[in-house]
């Protein structure tokens, strides 16, 4: 049976030391058994490595930063669609999802571009500042947390919080602080990059495990692959990991999909204590950067997401391979200045 030709736009091309999910999502789509894909990259900066990976990305366009707002993004997507006739868009950054969710209906009705995203209500409910209430609603243990917006609130964290504690940005970054002085340092660092509020979270001793999963928007779970980090960078990112047999983690993801009716991909970051108690510490509302491990384990989540976006009925994956490793590596590309100039000055390559 011939593969279906389809044009898919993908963001998150920053394959750096803190990589975006875009390149592994594209690799998964390139290996699709049902789609013959033309990949359109959506980039924010001229030095995102994926722009120059021409074996993976057929054409790249710069798009406005999320802070520019949904209207500017829509105008740029109209221009891109006029050239590329996009079928599906897969956004891969937390910070851009707000705009893409707002535009989902317009993209579909005006241009016929499909997405597979949660609702705005679902997206906001799992924000870090709302996570504790979210856990209570869905019957999942969450570490105690509090959002702060002023330096003066740091001194009053005790006795409610014991040190060490975790200081988190509203989109990215998390630091373990052992003193109030360290909290202040991380507060300044995070607000300069991501703005307010800053989240203070109880530190849970244990082993971090993660699961990438895909929901159908009707309460069902299409697939889930749990992973344990084997090597972690100084930014806390997994440089290698292994798929594990963890039924409790999969059950947690299934329960969340059942009660929230989440549509699309997500990642759950969980701490498993020595007493085998599971605490959900974060919900990332998109595929993780290690999503290609799921493909290697027999579950192609990006392909399934595209099928759902196109309105197809997708059967749930029944199994995955345990004991498969992903090992990330750095790679030097040689790029001509003319290519860099094109993306920098013309906004496309």
Language model regions located:
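Conserved metal-phosphate-binding beta-hairpin within the catalytic cores
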Residues: 258-293
């Amino acid at each position: 049976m011939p593969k279906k030709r389809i044009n898919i736009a993908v963001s998150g091309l920053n394959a750096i030391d803190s990589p975006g999910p875009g390149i592994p999502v594209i690799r998964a789509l390139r290996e699709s058994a049902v789609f013959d894909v033309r990949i359109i990259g959506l980039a924010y900066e001229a030095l995102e490595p994926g722009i120059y990976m021409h074996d993976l990305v057929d054409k790249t366009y710069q798009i406005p930063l999320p802070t520019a707002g949904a209207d500017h993004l829509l105008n740029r997507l109209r221009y891109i669609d006029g050239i590329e006739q996009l079928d599906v868009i897969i956004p891969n950054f937390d910070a851009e999802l707000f705009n893409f969710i707002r535009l989902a209906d317009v993209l579909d009705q005006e241009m016929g571009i499909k997405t597979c995203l949660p609702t705005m209500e679902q997206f906001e409910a799992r924000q870090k500042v709302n996570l504790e209430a979210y856990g209570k609603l869905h019957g999942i243990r969450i570490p105690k947390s509090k959002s702060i917006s002023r330096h003066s609130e740091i001194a009053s964290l005790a006795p409610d919080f014991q040190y060490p504690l975790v200081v988190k940005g509203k989109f990215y970054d998390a630091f373990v602080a052992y003193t109030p002085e360290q909290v202040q340092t991380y507060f300044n660092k995070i607000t300069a990059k991501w703005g307010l509020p800053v989240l203070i979270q109880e530190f849970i001793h244990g082993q971090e495990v993660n699961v990438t999963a895909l929901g159908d928007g009707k309460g069902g779970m299409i697939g889930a692959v749990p992973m344990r980090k084997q090597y972690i960078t100084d930014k806390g990112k997994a440089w290698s990991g292994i798929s594990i047999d963890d039924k409790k983690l999969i059950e947690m993801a299934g329960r969340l999909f059942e009660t929230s009716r989440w549509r699309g991909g997500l990642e759950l970051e969980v701490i498993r204590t020595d007493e085998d108690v599971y605490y959900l510490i974060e919900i990332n509302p998109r595929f993780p950067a290690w999503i290609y491990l799921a493909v290697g384990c027999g579950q192609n989540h990006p392909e399934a997401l595209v099928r759902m976006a196109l309105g197809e009925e997708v059967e749930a994956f029944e199994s995955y391979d345990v004991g498969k490793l992903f090992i990330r590596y750095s790679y030097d590309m040689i790029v001509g200045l003319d290519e860099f100039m094109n993306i920098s000055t013309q906004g496309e390559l």
